[in-house]
Every structure is written in C-alpha cells, then in structure tokens.
C-alpha cells in the first residue's frame, strides 16, 4: 500500500533547488551587471531611464540606475542592495561593486556546474578578500594631516577622480575645489545634512557658487512683502511652527448669534488673537521671522510697518538647517519667545539669482554650514550634477576621516590580482583554483575601463600584467592616450576605504548568492473584494477579508 503523500506547501508554490537554480541566480546577477557595465569610468556612457509616471532621469551613477530599475528577481535584488549600501557608506564605487560581485559569480560558475560544494567557494572567497584588504592597507599611501596644503591637494585630487566619470567631468577642477571648500567649512563631525544643494535654472555651470551659510529660495509671499527690508546686520531670528493668518472656519462649524454685536465680537476676537501673536513676536526683538506654516497678508503688512522680514511655508529641512546653524529652537507657540530660543547670524540678505530670489544667512555662530547653489540648463542635467556632487562630497568626507589613498584607473585591482595569483600558487588543492578565479575576476575593472573607452582591452591588460610583474604597482589604464600610465603620478587617486568597502561588499554578496540552495516563491493569494453597498450603510454586510496563506518550507 502506497503511503499518503504529505502536502506541505500550498498549491501553486514555485520551488526550485539544486545546481540549476544556483546557476539561474548567477545568470540573473549577470543581467544586472550588464545594465550598468557601460557606465564605468571617465569614458562611460549615460543611461536615460523613464519611470512609470513618465519622469526622465539621465545618470551614470550605478546606485541611481539600479534604484530606478524595478528589479523583481530575488537574487538580483542583492546586487541592487550592495550598490545602495556602497552609495550610503562611501558615496562612490557603486558601479565597481556591482561589476565585481557579478564577475566573482561568473568566474565560479563552472565550478558550481561541476558540483563543487558552495562552502568551499565561500571559504576561498573570504580568505582572498581578507588578503586583498590587508594588501590595500599595506600599500596605501598615507597623507599627513598636519600639512594643510598637502591635505587640501589630496582632497581635491580625490574629488576630481570621483567627478571624472560624471556628466560634469569638463568642469571637475572647478567643482572639486568647491566640494573641498564646502566640506572644509563644516565642523569635525562633517555632517552631510549641513551642506545644502539648491538648483537654479539658467546660467552656465561655472556660475554655480558656494555660500558660507544657509540659503533657500524665497517662499510665496503676500502683498506688503515689497515694503520689508531685505538686509539686516546681526538680526535675531524667530523660528516658528505657527500659523499667522486669518482662516475660514473648519467644515461644519456653526456659531449661533442673536445680534449683529455678537457677530462683531466674534470677528474682533479673531483679529485680537492674531494681533496678540504678532505683538509678542515684535516685542521679542526678532527682526527675521521664519515659519513652517503660512504667514498671511495681515501679518506680512504688520511686519513691514515695523521693519521686520517674514517668510512663511519655509520647507522643514531648510528651517532645521537654519536652527542648527543660527541657534535657537523652533517654537510651536509665541508665548515664550525669549532670547534663548531666538537664532542669530552676522548678516541676513535677500539676493536675486537667475530668475529666483534667495534668502541668505551668513556668519552663523552655532554650527558651521554651507550651501552650494547650482546653475545650469535642463532639469535632468542639474539633477545629475547634484548626484555627482553628492558622490564627490562623500569621497572627500571619507578621505578626511581615513587619510590613506590608492591609485585608481584599475591600478589597485591589477596589483591585487597579481598578489592573489602569486599567493594561489603557494597553496594546494581546490583553494588554489578558486583564489585564482577571484584574482582573475578583479581584472574586470581595468578591462571594462578599456572597453568603455573603445581600446583594445586584451593588449592593455597584457601590458599591465607585465608592468605589475616588474613592480610597477600603481600602473593602470590611461584613458587619454590609449596606453598604461603610473596613475599615482597622474593624480588619479581614491580613498583606500572606497576600494576596501567595494571588495568586502562584492565578496559578501557573491558568498550570499552562492550559499542559497533553494528558492521558494509563495503564490499570490487572491482576496475576494467585498460586495458593493447600496447607499450609506444600507448595503449587505461586507465579508471579512481572508488572511493571506503562508507556505512553510
């Protein structure tokens, strides 16, 4: 008699296991890498991505492209996640980390197909990653922080390297100086949120400027605004989350009055409440009033009569940055506007930039802050410029905190590849083959730089292997002359932490995907829609929703 089969998973559950599904996962990661492969390096191409709402984005930043792609394959999502983590941690190297992870998987695919146990692959990869990280730390060049000129030169070169692969690479000298100035203006914590980036359409890229303080676009204002002064020396600043305007009653509000005098008393009370708030703000000594909520026409004219400046509907991010820079605190009431809760700055002024007016707070005493005002033509171009500057700012912050650098342009990858290949010859067994595969995978970076520039990759990689074998450890791809060059002498520098982070993240992602031996996809549960009602509350009783089934593995 046949035993009764045990049905564990719900009907329709998709399960795949063994070598075929592991190979399928590796192939999915290859497809993700193909999407960003051509964006690597100074000769990389850009991608035009249109989302479901029709918004177009032009970018060659790996993390941005992968965020915008609606990836559904669960294994491929791992590569998207490591690109995001690289972007959040160090800002640059997002395309490199995706390519490395995909190439590690590609190199071990033959071993997987032959039935080599995944744990042997994982052990070899972890050994190779540890050796590579230690090698980077050994050969990285440290820059003395005591010599400010040398440190500044290092930071500018790191920023220029990060910008050389971007859309604004023609202006990398201009922007690398601006980025270094911006980061140097911050205090020791180097908080990213203390650097604001504002975009103003019109003008050339070189019209962009750095403001040593807080700047934001003038908000919507009512009649009477033109009478207010637009410049103050050492003003006190009131930061509010209070509505200063007369508003219509809420829906379904009802006031019953018997006489006209009663109605007049209600109207007078509303005006008195508003004027009472305005008087308290005026008596506090504040000359600049910023509020997250609207400031109406009555309040605007009241402040104009008393030589005060006001701005309502200020974005929360700008209000918080002003508070952190100028001191004080955001008040939800005007009853306790003492000197302690008012902010201060050396100079407040409103300036015309392009077609917009901007409010500037400079000489802020509390926290050092700055704002980059970008100029340019198309909106997509300016958004990509903002993303490029974000990457450069992150790189400069990392270089200040970790002051060791390595040469870019594929130089460090070729040196690690040679080092691991030499090491693999000293050990026996399967580990030798796997560490050799890891070493070969590292060559994807210089190879892809050559392919993207239209060079003969095989010829240049042969030259690089020969040069590194002779001890030229900083030799990498020279994209300007279709040759190899000492990239340390050519000032193509990157913080060592960027490469370390990329290697460890790519290796961990590859190990994670290799360690998955079964994929189980639950079927989507179909939920019955409740029947339509007949009028308000007079229909049939709606059926309760069924809970979603969860399959067990």
Curated annotation (Swiss-Prot):
The molecular function terms in GO held by this entry are:
ATP binding; ATP hydrolysis activity; ATP-dependent protein folding chaperone; unfolded protein binding
Assign the protein's first listed, main location to one coarse class. cytoplasm
Q: What is this protein called?
A: T-complex protein 1 subunit eta
Q: What does this protein do?
A: Component of the chaperonin-containing T-complex (TRiC), a molecular chaperone complex that assists the folding of actin, tubulin and other proteins upon ATP hydrolysis.
Top enzyme category: hydrolase
Tell me the organism: Gallus gallus
Recorded catalytic activity of this chain's protein: ATP + H2O = ADP + phosphate + H(+)
The record, for PROSITE patterns, names: TCP1_1, TCP1_2, TCP1_3
Give the family per the record.
Belongs to the TCP-1 chaperonin family.
Q: Which GO terms describe its cellular component?
A: chaperonin-containing T-complex
Q: Which NCBIfam families match?
A: chap_CCT_eta (TIGR02345), thermosome_alpha (NF041082), thermosome_beta (NF041083)
Q: How does it assemble?
A: Component of the chaperonin-containing T-complex (TRiC), a hexadecamer composed of two identical back-to-back stacked rings enclosing a protein folding chamber. Each ring is made up of eight different subunits: TCP1/CCT1, CCT2, CCT3, CCT4, CCT5, CCT6A/CCT6, CCT7, CCT8.
Q: Where in the cell is it found?
A: Cytoplasm
Residues bound to Mg(2+)? 92
Q: Where does ADP bind?
A: 41, 93-96, 164-165, 409, 494, 499
Region annotation Disordered: residue ranges? Answer: 523-553
Listed A to Z, the keywords are: ATP-binding, Chaperone, Cytoplasm, Hydrolase, Magnesium, Metal-binding, Nucleotide-binding
């Amino acid at each position: 008699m046949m035993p009764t089969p045990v049905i564990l998973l719900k009907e329709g559950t998709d399960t795949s296991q063994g070598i075929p599904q592991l190979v399928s996962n590796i192939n999915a990661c290859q497809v993700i890498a193909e999407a960003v492969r051509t964006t690597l390096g100074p000769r990389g191409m850009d991608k035009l991505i249109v989302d479901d709402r029709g918004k177009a984005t032009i970018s060659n930043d790996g993390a941005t492209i992968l965020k915008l792609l609606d990836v559904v394959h669960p294994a491929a999502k791992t590569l998207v996640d490591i690109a995001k983590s690289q972007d959040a941690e160090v800002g640059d190297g997002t395309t490199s980390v995706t390519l490395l992870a995909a190439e590690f998987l590609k190199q071990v695919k033959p071993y997987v197909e032959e039935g080599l146990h995944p744990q042997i692959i994982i052990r070899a990869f972890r050994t190779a990653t540890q050796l590579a990280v230690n090698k980077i730390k050994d050969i990285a060049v440290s820059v003395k922080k005591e010599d400010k000129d040398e440190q500044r030169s290092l930071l500018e070169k790191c920023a220029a390297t990060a910008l050389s692969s971007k859309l604004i690479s023609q202006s990398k000298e201009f922007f690398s100086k601006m980025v270094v100035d911006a980061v140097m203006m911050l205090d020791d914590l180097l908080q990213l949120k203390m650097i604001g980036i504002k975009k103003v359409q019109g003008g050339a890229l070189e019209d962009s400027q750095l403001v040593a303080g807080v700047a934001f676009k003038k908000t919507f204002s009512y009649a009477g605004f033109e009478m207010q002064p637009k410049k103050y020396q050492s003003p006190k600043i009131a930061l509010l989350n209070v509505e200063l305007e007369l508003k219509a009653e809420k829906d379904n509000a009802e006031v019953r009055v018997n006489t006209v005098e009663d109605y007049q008393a209600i109207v007078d009370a509303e005006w008195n409440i508003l004027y009472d708030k305005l008087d308290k703000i005026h008596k506090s000594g504040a000359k600049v009033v910023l509020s997250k909520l609207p400031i109406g026409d009555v309040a605007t004219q009241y402040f104009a009569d008393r030589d005060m400046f006001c701005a309502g509907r200020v974005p929360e991010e700008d209000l918080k940055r002003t508070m952190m820079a100028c001191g004080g605190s955001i008040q939800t009431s005007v009853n306790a506007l003492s000197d302690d809760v008012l902010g201060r700055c050396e100079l407040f002024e409103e300036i015309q930039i392009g077609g917009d007016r901007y409010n500037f707070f400079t000489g802020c005493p509390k926290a050092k802050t700055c704002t980059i005002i970008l100029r340019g033509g198309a909106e997509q171009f300016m958004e990509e410029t903002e993303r490029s500057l974000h990457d450069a700012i992150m790189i400069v912050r990392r270089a200040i905190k970790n002051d060791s650098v390595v040469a870019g342009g594929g130089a460090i990858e070729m040196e690690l590849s040679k080092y691991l290949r030499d090491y693999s010859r000293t050990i026996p067994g399967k580990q030798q083959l796997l560490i050799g595969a890891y070493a070969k995978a590292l060559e994807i970076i210089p190879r892809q730089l050559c392919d993207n520039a239209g060079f003969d990759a095989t010829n240049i990689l042969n030259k690089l292997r020969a040069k590194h074998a002779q001890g030229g450890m900083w030799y990498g791809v020279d994209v300007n002359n279709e040759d190899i060059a000492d990239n340390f002498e050519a000032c193509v520098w990157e913080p060592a932490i960027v490469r370390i982070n990329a290697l460890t993240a790519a290796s961990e992602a590859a190990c994670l995907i290799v360690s998955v031996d079964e994929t189980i996809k639950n079927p989507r549960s179909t939920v019955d829609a409740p029947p339509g009602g007949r009028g308000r509350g007079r229909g049939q009783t709606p059926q309760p929703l069924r809970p979603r089934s969860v399959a067990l593995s």
